[in-house]
């Protein structure tokens, strides 16, 4: 399984052409192994709608349910070990709790994270694609 960062998941569902071709290729290449989406990404999507930084033509709950029903998508639940790991990330990592939880999820599940987030890309203590 690979873990999709929130922005990758949203753009892939809304319009995959918003993603660079290299990211589209990574998703296609790893689909058969499973595409993980952290439950925190669901919270982030709802928060982005609340803050008017995203806009959907449907209720956010319906959008999330539809987006999670895509083939090969696996919802990755928050566990106590992920919660604790997010507070113990080695090295320097920025203070965004959602990013901390997503990185901790990738670390606990020992799977690569697909992201375009520069702050996460600069972090050397998580497997990246």
Provide a role label for each language-model segment.
Residues 1-37, 51-66, 109, 118-119:
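Short, well-structured N-terminal submotif of metal-dependent ribonuclease cores
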Residues 15-16, 48-51, 70, 89, ...:
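Residue-level signal for well-ordered alpha-helical positions
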Residues 57-61, 70-116:
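Active-site neighborhoods of divalent-metal-dependent phosphate/nucleic-acid chemistry enzymes
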Residues 119-126:
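Short loop/helix-cap segments at secondary-structure boundaries that form the rim of catalytic
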Residues 31, 71-73, 124:
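A short helix-to-beta-strand connector/capping loop
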Residues 45:
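Phosphate/NTP-binding elements of NTP-utilizing enzymes
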């Amino acid at each position: 399984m690979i873990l999709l960062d929130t922005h990758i998941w949203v753009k892939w569902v809304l319009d995959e052409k918003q993603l660079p071709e290299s990211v589209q290729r990574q998703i296609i290449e790893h689909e058969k192994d499973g595409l993980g989406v952290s439950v925190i990404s669901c919270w982030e999507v709802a928060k982005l709608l609340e803050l008017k930084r995203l806009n959907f033509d449907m209720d956010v709950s319906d959008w999330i349910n539809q987006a999670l029903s895509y083939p090969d998508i696996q919802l990755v639940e928050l566990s106590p070990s992920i919660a604790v790991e997010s507070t113990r990330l080695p090295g320097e990592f920025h203070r965004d709790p959602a990013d901390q939880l997503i990185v901790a999820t990738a670390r606990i599940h020992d799977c690569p994270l697909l992201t375009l987030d520069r702050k996460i890309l600069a972090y050397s203590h998580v497997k990246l694609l």
